[in-house]
């Protein structure tokens, strides 16, 4: 097994020799040369958030809450296009905002989670689409509540270092405290919720902090077995953000992080967002990714609106050029489709 020390040494090295050695190891563990993706619809239920991250443009003071009719319209269109995943997302703890609460009450809901539950339930009852929710920090009871209407859920760890809470990236973001995020990911494991997490590359973290974060994810997965995929997401400069002058991670920096993550995490799928890496995506295929994540024929990436999705044919072409077969998957990985990992009512739709 790759040790923490060896992994940090690899990231610090500027020699090509270790890269070639790692590539040989990756080729020896390649998962049948398959690369997966999920055909999805991105539904930003509300774009207010208690966190003000130095790299994000999703949050808006002049927020919008999507109406149920707006959500239904997207879901029905997505269903007609053959999508199988609905990514429901909103900012963290939106109920802290009194104006958000007032609007939800006018819509007939006590809080945002009650509204989300209703949307997910409608999705399951009226379409072939399966809900996946990523909405920031949730406690044990909230996760348990949403498990009934979600096949999987997600939360980026981002980084396990508390030091970043004092930097421009997270100094105004109480929900980015890694203790809170680790607690939620562990609670999802206790509840047997198939889970997506990941780390951000290029937000001011050190090589050691990157590796520690990957090993923290490994620790949680070894304890609960619930992490189905890990996203290695590169920071991208956006106009007007506090981190506008930060340097984006280089392709080789990302390539090495993908390789080392795959060798550390072994059976967990590794994903790099294809819309953030259109020119370098093939490099990451060589480096060990086995999933492209959600790709939508209908909706944009509301977190990275400047980066359009590649179409499925484009992904297929550059997968095939390296001998990979592109395969569609559900928002829940096949090994989790059983009564231990999914609500019995949802399971009936899948078997």
Swiss-Prot record:
Its EC number is 4.3.1.32. GO terms for molecular function: 4 iron, 4 sulfur cluster binding; 7,8-didemethyl-8-hydroxy-5-deazariboflavin synthase activity; iron ion binding; transferase activity, transferring alkyl or aryl (other than methyl) groups. InterPro entries: Aldolase_TIM (IPR013785), CofG_family (IPR019939), Elp3/MiaA/NifB-like_rSAM (IPR006638), F420 (IPR034405), rSAM (IPR007197). Gene3D superfamilies: Aldolase class I. Residues 35-275 form the Radical SAM core domain. Its cofactor is [4Fe-4S] cluster. Binds 1 [4Fe-4S] cluster. The cluster is coordinated with 3 cysteines and an exchangeable S-adenosyl-L-methionine. It holds the Pfam family Radical_SAM. Pathway: Cofactor biosynthesis; coenzyme F0 biosynthesis. Keywords: 4Fe-4S, Iron, Iron-sulfur, Lyase, Metal-binding, S-adenosyl-L-methionine. [4Fe-4S] cluster binds at residues 49, 53, 56. It catalyses: 5-amino-5-(4-hydroxybenzyl)-6-(D-ribitylimino)-5,6-dihydrouracil + S-adenosyl-L-methionine = 7,8-didemethyl-8-hydroxy-5-deazariboflavin + 5'-deoxyadenosine + L-methionine + NH4(+) + H(+). CDD domains: Radical_SAM. NCBIfam families: F420_cofG, PRK06245.1. Belongs to the radical SAM superfamily. CofG family. Consists of two subunits, CofG and CofH. Catalyzes the radical-mediated synthesis of 7,8-didemethyl-8-hydroxy-5-deazariboflavin from 5-amino-5-(4-hydroxybenzyl)-6-(D-ribitylimino)-5,6-dihydrouracil. This is 7,8-didemethyl-8-hydroxy-5-deazariboflavin synthase. The lineage of its organism: Archaea, Methanobacteriati, Methanobacteriota, Methanomada group, Methanococci. The gene is cofG.
């Amino acid at each position: 097994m790759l040790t923490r020390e060896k992994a940090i040494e690899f990231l610090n090295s500027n020699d090509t020799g270790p890269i070639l050695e790692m590539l040989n190891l990756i080729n020896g563990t390649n998962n049948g040369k398959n690369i997966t993706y999920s055909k999805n619809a991105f539904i930003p239920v509300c774009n207010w958030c208690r966190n003000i991250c130095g790299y994000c443009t999703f949050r808006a003071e002049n927020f919008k809450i999507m109406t149920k009719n707006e959500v239904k319209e997207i879901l029905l269109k997505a269903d007609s296009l053959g999508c199988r995943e609905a990514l429901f997302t909103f900012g963290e703890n939106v109920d802290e905002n009194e104006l958000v609460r007032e609007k939800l009450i006018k819509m007939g809901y006590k809080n945002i989670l009650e509204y989300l539950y209703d949307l997910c339930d409608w999705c399951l009852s009226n379409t072939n689409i399966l809900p996946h929710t990523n909405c920031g920090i949730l406690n044990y009871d909230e996760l348990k509540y949403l498990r009934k209407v979600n096949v999987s859920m997600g939360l980026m760890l981002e980084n396990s270092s508390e030091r970043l809470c004092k930097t421009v990236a997270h100094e105004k973001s109480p929900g980015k405290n890694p203790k809170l995020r680790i607690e939620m990911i562990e609670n999802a494991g206790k509840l047997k919720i198939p889970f997506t997490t990941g780390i951000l590359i290029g937000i001011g973290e050190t090589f050691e902090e990157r590796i520690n974060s990957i090993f923290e994810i490994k620790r949680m997965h070894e304890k609960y077995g619930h992490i189905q995929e890990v996203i290695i997401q590169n920071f991208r400069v956006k106009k007007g953000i506090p981190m506008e002058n930060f340097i984006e991670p280089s392709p080789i920096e990302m390539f090495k992080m993908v390789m080392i993550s795959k060798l550390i995490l072994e059976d967990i799928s590794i994903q790099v967002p294809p819309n953030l890496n259109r020119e370098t995506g093939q490099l990451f295929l060589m480096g060990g990714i086995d999933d492209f994540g959600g790709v939508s024929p209908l909706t944009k990436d509301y977190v990275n609106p400047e980066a359009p999705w590649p179409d499925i044919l484009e992904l297929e072409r550059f997968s095939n050029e390296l001998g990979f077969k592109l395969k569609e998957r559900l928002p829940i990985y096949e090994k989790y489709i059983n009564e231990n990992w999914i609500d019995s009512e949802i399971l009936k739709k899948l078997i």
